[in-house]
């Protein structure tokens, strides 16, 4: 049975060695990179199952590296590993498309557990279903793709899952907690503003295709819904 692969981008040798040992004990195949640019080169040819990414790299910002990796592989699970713990940094990472965020100092066992959680989330939403049209949207679950006015949207995994959830119940008002429970397997580890951040980026991507329509409604004090289509 082929082992699941983890790419670890971390320039602190001690941290990298500890994580490699723990991840290998958990059965993962691990490849370590001290810099970000070699990761981009390799990602053009292959993709890991999970990426663990330090924000403070010597050759490229971890945030910028994440952007470029997700442009190549939109469904790539990304876990940020960093000394930064301020809310603005967490929100920036989530807005870029990262899935989770662990601040140093951390427990290596916690990192391994979060990697397992990310993989469960991927598998949970990987069951294919027929392509369906909903108003001006087209939902292609096997390809993890949604089109708007016949134009494919470049979505991160959680943007895709959020929009898919709204698409399947047009007109229904979803609270933030309901959306977190539906999309994030471990909703208790998800920040309240995570949903707002992803909705904001979704709206921007929809507006870039058709600035005259705004299909996602905000219901103050209640949550979000998709307009009846």
From Swiss-Prot:
Entry-linked Pfam families: Response_reg, Trans_reg_C
One biological process term in Gene Ontology: regulation of DNA-templated transcription
Keyword Glycoprotein listed: no
Its main localization is cytoplasm
* Domain Response regulatory: from-to ranges: 5-119
Gene field? creB
From the UniProt record, which GO molecular function terms apply? cis-regulatory region sequence-specific DNA binding; identical protein binding; phosphorelay response regulator activity; transcription cis-regulatory region binding
Q: What is this protein called?
A: Transcriptional regulatory protein CreB
NCBIfam families tied to this protein: PRK11083.1
Alphabetically list the UniProt keywords: Cytoplasm, DNA-binding, Phosphoprotein, Transcription, Transcription regulation, Two-component regulatory system
What span is annotated as the signal peptide, if there is one?
Answer: none
List residues, modification 4-aspartylphosphate. Answer: 54
Look up the DNA-binding region in the UniProt entry and give its residue ranges. Answer: 129-228
């Amino acid at each position: 049975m082929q082992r699941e692969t983890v790419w670890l981008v971390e320039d602190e040798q001690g941290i990298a060695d500890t994580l490699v040992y723990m991840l290998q004990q958990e059965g993962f195949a691990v490849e370590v990179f001290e810099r970000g640019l070699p990761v981009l080169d390799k990602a053009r040819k292959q993709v890991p199952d999970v990426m663990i990414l330090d924000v403070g790299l010597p050759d490229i910002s971890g945030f910028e590296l994440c952007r470029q990796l997700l442009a190549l592989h939109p469904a790539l699970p990304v876990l940020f590993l960093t000394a930064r713990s301020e809310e603005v940094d967490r929100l920036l990472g989530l807005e870029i498309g990262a899935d989770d965020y662990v601040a140093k100092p951390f427990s290596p066992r916690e990192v391994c557990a979060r990697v397992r959680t990310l993989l469960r989330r991927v598998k949970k939403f990987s069951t294919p279903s027929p392509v369906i049209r909903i108003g001006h949207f087209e939902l292609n679950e096997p390809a993890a793709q949604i089109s708007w006015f016949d134009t494919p949207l470049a979505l991160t995994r959680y943007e895709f899952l959020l929009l898919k959830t709204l698409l399947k119940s047009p007109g229904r008002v979803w609270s933030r907690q309901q959306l977190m429970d539906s999309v994030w397997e471990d909703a208790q580890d998800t920040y309240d503003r995570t949903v707002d951040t992803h909705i904001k980026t979704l709206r921007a991507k929809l507006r870039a295709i058709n600035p005259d329509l705004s299909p996602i409604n905000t219901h103050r004090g209640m949550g979000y819904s998709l307009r009846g289509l």
